[in-house]
């Protein structure tokens, strides 16, 4: 065993780290099981706690909490027809139909077991792909990074909404926020309006806490729908028949896991898009498509495999290039910067033990998901009875304290509250917030690499296409923008 792997094992299996993982797992299971509290919110609420942790326990808390929250979102979807997380929404109707047929334990068991399988598959791809990509990325110059960031932002626009114009507006808003302050190549204050607090820019963490947590609190406050009732039927053995399902649907498991990992690696996509795509593909290629929507477990098997594999997939661009694959890894990148672990290829060469520790954390999180998920299913009815009108004030308190604790200033609390209101208004009007988040995270990197490239090339735009990898990334970026327009135009000319 190499010294780096030995250090990674020592870091991960430290007793303190094990306790952190268990506590974060229980927290993630609880948050995911409560309708409306998403895995992203679980991550955002953990950020203030990670201030007081070493890097590996901080990452351990986030990895385990998000993995558990993605799974436990299946529970209210199955028992109440109200998904706990967006990733569970794809197959909520299927799971609820199975519950009404007395097969709730099969639906929940499939979600649990195959989420863990998908998570392990995604982790294997992360372990195999990330070092190779990192070695390749060491050869990148500012030209390649500029196009790579632009490609990531482009994917975020087109993957998170069926209306790209709204995604583009959201992205522009995020890029505008990223421009605030002195942190730019010119060192000139931008959009500060004479406010000293804004010279350092808008804090990423208060902004994300506001956009993900405060927006949900506002949504709950204005929600007038009556609470849904739980299907009160006893749950049997959730593991019964799982081996039979694995033997019956091996292609679906592999396809869902592979698709989830691939979609997760696309910036801005995430587990929810992976689950929806996987469910649609499962129905399209099923031998029994007419059974979908009536309580057919096949779609749950494939989508469940996809949603957790997407989590590991999202870490590939985050660790290798510093480009978040989803909203969760956008928050993670902020945490890594706080811990002086700048994501990118240099992290693989300078601190390989930390990278290996991340691999181990993903493996452990998906393994302990089985027993902890089983326990969560058993106590799920008690969790779902927790009154949300008591829970939301507690969450609000955590948000305020966490935002204030970053710099001990009320300005960050104001940023959090304003961001929450803006995110709520955006989502209520059909604007996705993921492009805005990626704009905030990647705006500085985009500008820095653009300015650096312009200086290198003495102002020549042709240099952006001169290197083979840069030209390839440029072609991909332009194709994502213009191919849909070209296809639409050709269809119009053909009269289709």
Where are these regions (language model features)?
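Short helix-coil transition sites and intra-membrane helix breaks within transmembrane domains
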Residues: 30-41, 78-89, 121-125, 263-273, ...
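A structural-propensity feature for long, helix-poor, extended segments
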Residues: 66-77, 84-85, 296-321, 325, ...
């Amino acid at each position: 065993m190499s010294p780096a792997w030995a250090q990674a094992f020592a870091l991960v299996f430290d007793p303190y780290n094990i306790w952190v993982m268990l506590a974060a797992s229980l927290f993630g299971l609880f948050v995911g099981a409560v309708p409306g509290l998403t895995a992203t919110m679980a991550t955002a609420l953990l950020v203030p706690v990670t201030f007081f942790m070493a890097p590996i326990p901080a990452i351990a808390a986030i990895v385990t909490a998000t993995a558990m929250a993605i799974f436990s979102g299946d529970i209210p979807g199955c028992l109440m027809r109200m998904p706990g997380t967006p990733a569970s929404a794809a197959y909520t109707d299927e799971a609820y139909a199975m519950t009404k047929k007395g097969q709730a334990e099969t639906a929940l068991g499939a979600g649990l077991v195959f989420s863990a399988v998908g998570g392990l598959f995604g982790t294997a791809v992360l372990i195999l792909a990330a070092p190779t990509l990192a070695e390749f990325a060491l050869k990148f110059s500012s030209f390649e990074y500029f196009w790579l960031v632009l490609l990531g932002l482009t994917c975020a626009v087109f993957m998170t909404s069926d209306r790209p114009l709204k995604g583009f507006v959201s992205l522009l808003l995020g890029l505008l926020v990223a421009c605030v302050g002195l942190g730019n190549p010119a060192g000139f204050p931008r959009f500060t309006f004479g406010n000293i607090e804004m010279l350092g820019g808008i804090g990423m963490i208060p902004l994300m806490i506001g956009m993900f947590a405060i927006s949900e609190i506002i949504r709950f406050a204005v929600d007038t729908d009556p609470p849904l009732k739980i299907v009160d039927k006893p749950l049997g053995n959730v593991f019964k028949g799982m081996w039979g399902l694995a033997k019956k649907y091996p292609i679906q498991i592999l396809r869902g896991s592979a698709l989830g990992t691939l979609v997760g690696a696309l910036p801005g996509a995430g587990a929810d898009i992976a689950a929806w795509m996987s469910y649609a593909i499962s129905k399209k290629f099923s031998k029994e498509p007419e059974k979908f929507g009536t309580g057919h477990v096949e779609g749950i098997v494939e989508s469940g495999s996809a949603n957790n594999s997407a989590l590991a997939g999202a870490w590939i661009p985050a660790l290798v290039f510093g480009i978040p694959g989803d909203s969760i890894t956008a928050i993670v990148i902020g945490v890594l910067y706080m811990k002086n672990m700048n994501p990118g290829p240099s992290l693989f060469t300078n601190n390989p033990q930390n990278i290996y520790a991340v691999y181990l954390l993903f493996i452990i999180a998906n393994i302990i998901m089985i027993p902890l998920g089983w326990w969560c299913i058993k106590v799920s009815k008690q969790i779902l009875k927790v009154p949300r009108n008591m829970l939301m004030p507690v969450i609000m308190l955590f948000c305020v304290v966490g935002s204030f604790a970053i710099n001990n200033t009320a300005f960050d609390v104001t940023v959090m509250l304003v961001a929450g209101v803006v995110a709520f208004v955006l989502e209520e009007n059909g604007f996705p917030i993921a492009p805005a988040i990626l704009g905030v995270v990647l705006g500085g990197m985009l500008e820095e690499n653009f300015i650096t490239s312009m200086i290198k090339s003495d102002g020549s735009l042709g240099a952006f296409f001169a290197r083979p990898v840069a030209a390839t990334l440029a072609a991909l970026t332009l194709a994502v923008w213009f191919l849909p327009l070209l296809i639409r135009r050709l269809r119009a000319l053909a009269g289709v």
